[in-house]
Regions:
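C-terminal segment of N-terminal export signals and the immediately downstream linker at the start
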Residues: 6-40
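Short extracytoplasmic
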Residues: 28-58
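N-terminal export leaders
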Residues: 1-15, 109, 135
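Short, amphipathic alpha-helical segments
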Residues: 2-5, 46, 76, 89-91
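Proteins with a high burden of low-complexity, intrinsically disordered sequence enriched in S/T/G/P/A and R
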Residues: 17-18, 22, 49, 56, ...
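A generic secondary-structure signal for well-formed alpha-helical elements
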Residues: 8, 17-18, 45, 49, ...
């Protein structure tokens, strides 16, 4: 446990001391590590909801774009917390120890990502459960905010407000 704490502190120091300052424009974007993490968890969280076949990649990319847009609309303090979460998950030693995902995110198996999400969802630690909920809500909000998903749930779309 002390080793995990040391890794977390080391990663925090690395990101606070050596990370380049973020601008307003870059605050709206997810970095490549965060995009890779979300791209790995989207198919697991949305299993059974995402289309299969050739439409699957496009649906995942649209969901990733929706997540990016949703995160950009969050208050700066929440975006900073998400940045810290994604930095923790992107850093190989903490990804392995805290998430149990041994491969880089783009190469992670569906099973290892599902196990990671399940462990965090059911963790006795409130912080891990909160992190799971944040990722889960971002992905679900991005997917169900996408018109591609509406037909599958019987939602006809927003009503027309046209007068006349």
């Amino acid at each position: 446990m002390a080793g995990v704490a040391a890794l977390v502190v080391a990663r925090w120091l690395y990101t606070t001391v050596s990370a380049p300052p973020r601008t307003a424009a870059s605050d709206a974007a997810l970095d490549s590590d965060a995009r890779a993490i979300l791209a790995a968890i989207i198919p697991v969280i949305l299993e059974g909801a995402l289309p299969v076949g050739s439409d699957a990649a496009a649906a995942r990319d649209e969901t990733l774009a929706g997540a990016r847009e949703a995160i950009a609309g969050l208050p700066p303090s929440v975006r900073r917390e998400l940045d810290q979460l994604f930095a923790l998950l992107a850093f190989a030693p903490t990804r392995c120890i805290v998430a149990g995902v041994w491969s880089p995110w783009p190469d992670a198996s569906r099973e290892s990502v599902a196990a990671f999400l399940g462990h965090w969802r059911d963790s006795r630690f409130a912080l891990l459960r909160s992190a799971y909920e944040a990722m889960h809500q971002i992905v679900l909000g991005a997917w169900y905010g996408n018109p591609r998903s509406w037909g599958a749930i019987g939602y006809p779309g927003p009503p027309s407000l046209a007068v006349g």
